[in-house]
Swiss-Prot record:
The lineage of its organism: Bacteria, Bacillati, Mycoplasmatota, Mycoplasmoidales, Mycoplasmoidaceae. One of its GO terms (cellular component) is cytosolic large ribosomal subunit. GO terms for biological process: translation. The keyword Ribosomal protein applies. This is Large ribosomal subunit protein bL35. Keywords: Ribonucleoprotein, Ribosomal protein. It comes from Ureaplasma parvum serovar 3 (strain ATCC 700970).
């Protein structure tokens, strides 16, 4: 008989991806709309993916 396992939280699975080293990759916020006041440089930096902190990674990997 199979053991009970925790189901994947789909909201977390859609927002984060796991890198080869086990870190969580995420997108930056504040890019969808109302970005006219932000400079081009600031918007360009938000384009790149970010790596989550190690303390948050432990919490979110349980959901995946």
């Amino acid at each position: 008989m199979a053991k009970i396992r925790q189901k994947t939280k789909r909201a977390v699975a859609k927002r984060f991806s796991i890198t080869k080293n086990g870190k969580l990759k995420r997108k930056h916020a504040y890019r969808s709309h109302l970005a006219l006041g932000r400079s081009t440089k600031a918007k360009r930096h938000l384009r790149k993916d970010a790596i989550m902190s190690t303390s948050d990674t432990k919490r979110y990997t349980q959901c995946l």
